[in-house]
Amino acid sequence: MRTFRLFFIGLIFIMDMSLSSSDQCQQETVRLRAQLKTLEVQVMKQQQELIQTLSSQRTEQLALYQDTFHDLGDHQYRDCAQIFNAGNKGSGFYTIRPMTSPSLVRVYCDMTEGGGWTVIQRRSDGSQSFNKPWSDYQRGFGDLQSASGEFWLGNDNLYYLTSQGDYNLRINLADFEGVQRYAVYKNFKVADEKEFYQLQFGEFSGDSGDSLSGSYHPEVQWWASHQGMKFSTYDKDNDRYERNCAQEDKGGWWFNRCHSANLNGYYYHGAYSAVTDNGVVWYTWHGWWYSLKSVVMKIRPAAFEPNVV
């Protein structure tokens, strides 16, 4: 009898434990469901915020594109100077067709500093790699949609443009301290691919120093001057160096052995002191070991006279 009572008491204890565990499970299930519902609400809210952000960014990009692209209809112009003198005074993207170009070319026209400038290169934030193969430099690459985008207009296009007559090259430079300098070269000309896009330029003026000619120091001119140099990329070495300048300096350029200017070098996000000169370099201003913050290279006919009518 005593054994039966003990068995009965144990059975009741086990049933109580089971009921208690069941209640705990139900409570835990309710708690987890509440947490899951909260997480679902948070995820939906984040998704809506992300969609709104992306939509806003897309709208801003479209607005920027619409604000900076100028549709001139069926009119064709050889460069931005002709566009300016036709009465189009706003900086932005246009299409041109140089005399020997087989197709239309999308360009950015800078209508400041007298107007009529065709921009051929821009560096601003490192968003584009300039360590590109020959074919990319030949046809051009980069962001030709946003007004501050980085790009190279293309060596073929440089040839088409500069074969139309005498052009001046203006280079605007800025460092990370907010200081700006400029260089202007007369008679800027780029040959065709058969001549490896050989570079020619004339007299210098400006406040940045003449890095392209290497004339700042006669002892280095033989290896630092870019006058008459052929264009080189990491996969097509046309420099005078026993190794490959473009490969070492991270960009295509008119290298000698190797350079005193390399505006297509590796973009460093801040001034730097380095053991190599592979940055965005203009020697006569900041030396070989300082990489510049921004660069704009642009050309305009030497005979350009703004039409003020």
Language model: regions and residue ranges:
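C-terminal helix/juxtamembrane-tail motif
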Residues: 276-309
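Extracellular/mature segments of secreted proteins
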Residues: 29-37, 116-120, 252-256, 265-269
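Glycine-anchored, exposed beta-strand/edge motif detector
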Residues: 131, 240-287
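Extended, non-catalytic structural segments that build the interaction scaffolds
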Residues: 219-248
